[in-house]
Amino acid sequence: MELYELGIKQAQEGLAKGEFSSVELTQAIIDRYHEKNGEIGAYLTFDEEGALKLAREADEKRSCAPRIAPASQLAPLGGYSLTSGKDSASPLFGIPIAIKDLINVAGQPCTCASKILKGYVSPYDATVIKNLKQNGFIPAGRVNMDEFAMGSSTENSGLGVTRNPYDLTRVPGGSSGGSAAAVGGNLCIAALGTDTGGSIRQPASFCNCVGVKPSYGRVSRFGVTAFASSLDQVGPMTKSVEDAAILLKALAGHDEMDGTTPKDPVPDYAKAIEGASMKGVKLGLAKEYLEVSGMDPEVKRLTDEAIRKCEQAGAELVEVSLPHTEYAMAVYYIIAPAEASANLARFDGVRYGHRSEKATDVFTLYTKSRAEGFGPEVKRRIIMGTYVLSSGYYDAYYGKAQKVRTLIKRDFDEAFKKVDALITPCAPTPAFKFGANQDPLTMYLNDLYTIPSALAGVCASSVPAGFTQDAKLPVGVQFVCGGFEEEKLLKVSAAFEGIR
């Protein structure tokens, strides 16, 4: 096995045994980046020199060897260094991890794949990055995404095309398409993504990797550029469920900068999944997910096969109903654009980002900067959001959508009184061809199975289930558990991973 093929657990075991160094591991990722990123396009930027300096520090601290360079030369990324105050026993110590390009890292670009932020360099770290730095990780470049996380294919990026590593004529999914392509194409050891309505889970399904959307509030949003503030969550995208458990443990926890994060202690997820089994697990089958017209036959076959394997492994199948699922798409596309229109109002060409050179007064500065900087899909959602929040329409649309959202959450609460987890398809189709879903409504349906759990704020995962028979495209299944039940979710996901 090549070093770039390793996951977090495998890499850390090899480092601990001295089979290879962090420098060798990081160099393998850099070499893979040069070999494959030209055709896949997962990364937007990669600070090779900074990553190698940190890898050298990790090796020196691990071996307690004398330093081989002055401190002034070994402090890249806004002063980040591994020489002191970091836990060299952490499973993330010296491990290169790719970062979705809306998560702020001090000293690195943060463009949200948008022309309006091209050239912007972050002056501070997001809380999730602070947490990872305490664990001694190595930032392994910025990966592409749909502009401001608005999309399901990464075709909406304003800065470049990302292709599916399993078929370069197809999309990697979105909005965390760069993260998924980097993991699935072995251009990184693991990656960070964000999920608003399915943006971790759907691309994970398309690119044959594990993706976890934590419960709303499990992971701090501070320093993550906001799309829809009541939905956004950062989560791991990895090569195994165990890797996801390791990474989620480092990401999660209370943050004074994000009032949605509780002070409850974060479990040791990796320890919790040891010996995970399907035996005795009550697995919910919701007709609203499994009896849907338009589902690709191969997705249905692989989902049915996954359910059968779970039952054979000892799971108890229980039929449940989530009756308000049919309203989830409409609710999401009222609430999310409404929040986006408010969040994106800050990008005005005055304080940072793109500033139009054609403006003659303040008003035209605002309008021209935004018109030149935002892409078509972002503009579409800003207009939708502004409309539903406008006088005379707020109660008719946004107010009612929030009421129905409460009913959707109640459906999940009732279901989890009867079952431990739900199993559903992750996306209605495998990865589709570029340009195949030009109609916005058709594109929005890619998140049909992932949006309801996002609205409910519960946790969910995508786990690889197999490949289509014809095109050999990866397909994932989704597991959903209740709010702050990530231990249970990861146990079920790991159990399925072991029997698939």
Predicted regions and their residues:
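Glycine-rich, small-residue loops and helix-cap segments
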Residues: 18, 94, 134, 188, ...
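Flexible, acidic loop-helix segments that line cofactor/substrate-binding pockets
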Residues: 41, 258-266, 281-282, 286-289, ...
